[in-house]
Amino acid sequence: MTSATIPGLDTAPTKHQGLLAWVQEVAELTQPDRVVFADGSDEEYERLCAHLVEAGTFQKLNPEKQPNSYLALSDPSDVARVESRTFICTEREIDAGPTNNWMDPAEMRGIMTDLYRGSMRGRTLYVVPFCMGPLDAEDPKLGVEITDSEYVVVSMRTMTRMGRAALDKLGDDGFFVKALHSIGAPLEPGQKDVPWPCNDTKYITHFPETREIWSFGSGYGGNALLGKKCYSLRIASAMAHDEGWLAEHMLILKLISPENKAYFIAAAFPSACGKTNLAMLQPTIEGWRAETVGDDIAWMRFGKDGRLYATNPEFGFFGVAPGTNWSSNPNAMKTIAAGNTVFTNVAKTDDGDVWWEGLEGDPQHLIDWKGNDWTPESGEKAAHPNSRYCTPISQCPTLAPEWDDPQGVPISAILFGGRRKTTVPLITEARDWQHGVFIGATLGSEQTAAAEGKVGTVRRDPMAMLPFLGYNVGDYFAHWINVGKNADESKLPKVFFVNWFRRGDDGRFLWPGFGENSRVLKWAVERIEHKADGKSTPIGIVPTAADLDLEGLDVDPADVDEALAVKPEEWRAELPLIEEWFEFVGEKLPTGLKDEFDALKERLG
């Protein structure tokens, strides 16, 4: 089939020659039945959802329980990001660095071009223009995803500013990131489709130097919604390195004091460390309030006033469902309850509602994520551990009015945090920016699921970016240091290291966490205002229990002391682990971080 015979190619709603040429090239390669430019309208969304219901991909949920919401159950082989099939293809291997899978770009293009050949036969090729961050930003970052998945089109409408407005912003010659996606499941004439088409062969490939993403074989989440981690972190981190800004795996929170002063905080935590819960915090201390700017990604650059400003480039939440409930995260539950949600791989109740592990209620019968009958005796989880809700951010009851500000919000503090049973205190303040970079660069978190390796072993996850770096980790650390060097030191955010997960000898959590974490954040903002004390320790400045506002908190004071304790012998045991990590980073490790390591060693004696 030539381009002349592919319906929809000749009626494109754009004069952008670069875009048109690319769409034609992809259509000739992948051989779809038709080409459709997504416009992002309500009518299109409803039409595609109805099509997905008809195809068996979506089940419409009970509108009284979940208004205008749907459930999708994926193929059991296609349930999560696949780090082993994720590649960074730079011209030189060293530019991808030791934390990434690398292949020569020409070789990868050859392999994937063969896979794409005819891969959309029997399907529709959708052209999905989108903008990361506000459309009226000074330097809007645009992308176009080509996909053969309706699930992707409807999800991209929730997760990004997608459709006609983004296409108009592109104009006739604007730059955009090319994001090509195919599930790799062509249909022969008369062949019956399956509810969740995908391919056993999977590649999620990034070409940072040409700002391109090629994904094949997966219809799921971050592998297929290419604005998510692929663009907003892997490609954007490379763009940020070249252009002098930061693209980070961070929530953005607005904390408001009783005096009505607002502080914006960015925080990087690895998965399963409570990022979304903190982003939607409900403070437990009198007079303090919190609002949400973002729960996953922060793009940060310096404003004209010399302060660091952050933007959430996303338009929705793509949250992990299990563990989310009315006590751990009431604001997430209210956001979901407003409707317009696509759930993936959660369980379904007999009355057409959804359920997952950790949710209130004690169902006696469900249809599980594999589509099978489930009872409490089944002996396996009803919802997949990585099951998701995809919901518009505009429905969040605590959404900060500044969330859509094209200038972003000025950041007062950056938090790094992981899940550590021992060693790391509840909160530590870095001595200065470079020391803060050292803290982020050595961030470790205990594995939480047996599948990821031995439970309890500490995996280094620098700035919580290990799976998301678009270039060499050593160059990334150097970039962070340079960002600080090129700034007015007095205007840089303070950096803190937090650990909500420290345990006592008997294995219980020493700190209650969740809304009580507002007490820890209060100390951080009081440090910014020079109103709170802390004691200097070998690892940084740590509060005593007396420095924290513990009024009305029902916790044993000895537990708080233990949560804040700095034990030199535990830190001395940490040193060889940090050294091993730095050796892995290799020759590109900045001298500044070696200096910080030597200074820590010396302070520990």
UniProtKB/Swiss-Prot annotation:
EC number: 4.1.1.32
Protein name per UniProt: Phosphoenolpyruvate carboxykinase [GTP]
Source species: Mycolicibacterium smegmatis
Gene Ontology terms for molecular function: GTP binding; manganese ion binding; phosphoenolpyruvate carboxykinase (GTP) activity
Record annotation: effect of changing residue 83 to A: Exhibits a very low activity in either the OAA- or the PEP-forming direction. With Mn(2+) at 0.2 mM, the specific OAA-forming activity is 0.9% that of the wild-type
Required co-factors: Mn(2+)
Null mutant phenotype: Cells lacking this gene are inhibited when they grow on acetate and palmitate.
Gene Ontology CC terms, in alphabetical order: cytosol
Regulation of catalytic or functional activity: Inhibited by oxalate and by alpha-ketoglutarate. In vitro, the enzyme is stimulated by reducing agents such as dithiothreitol (DTT), reduced glutathione and 2-mercaptoethanol.
Known outcome of mutating residue 75 to S: Significantly reduced carboxykinase activity. The affinity for Mn(2+), OAA and PEP decreases 3-, 2- and 3-fold compared to the wild-type, respectively
Family annotation (Gene3D superfamilies): 3.90.228.20, Phosphoenolpyruvate Carboxykinase, domain 1, Phosphoenolpyruvate Carboxykinase, domain 2
Temperature dependence: Optimum temperature is 70 degrees Celsius.
Keyword Transferase: no
Residue positions binding Mn(2+): 229, 249, 296
Top EC class, one word: lyase
Record's cofactor remark: Binds 1 Mn(2+) ion per subunit. Can also use Co(2+) ion.
